Amino acid sequence: MKNYDFHHLLEPVEFREFARDIIQVREKIRLEAFREGPDQGMDARCITPDGKCIVMQAKRWANESALRWKELREEKKKADRIKPDRYILVLSRDVSPEQKKKIRELFHPYIIADEDIVTGKDLNGYLGSNDVGYA
């Protein structure tokens, strides 16, 4: 399996675009991209044909640092304003199963499955997969 450190490898904008590209392939959807700067809680968005709103937010954080719970709580407030049907959080860093559970609980009801919390290990797994349309 690949073992890229996305925090050190990519600049914030590059990581956001990379995350969007990976999620588009994984989910087989087209995500709208937005300009740099304050994003009101969404780095990318898809409105499905049946009107569902899927939001993707990417966070480029170092593995060495503590998980930024304060920042995640602020993102949850933004999600509460948007009220997406589904929220996909892409992290450049890895998390423990307990941290993933707490993130999912924090973002309830928007994060609908553990797969909606994509970590650095997950991203490396997608890159190492032979299945181009990974889902």
What residue spans do the PLM features occupy?
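Mixed-charge (Asp/Glu-Lys/Arg
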Residues: 1-135
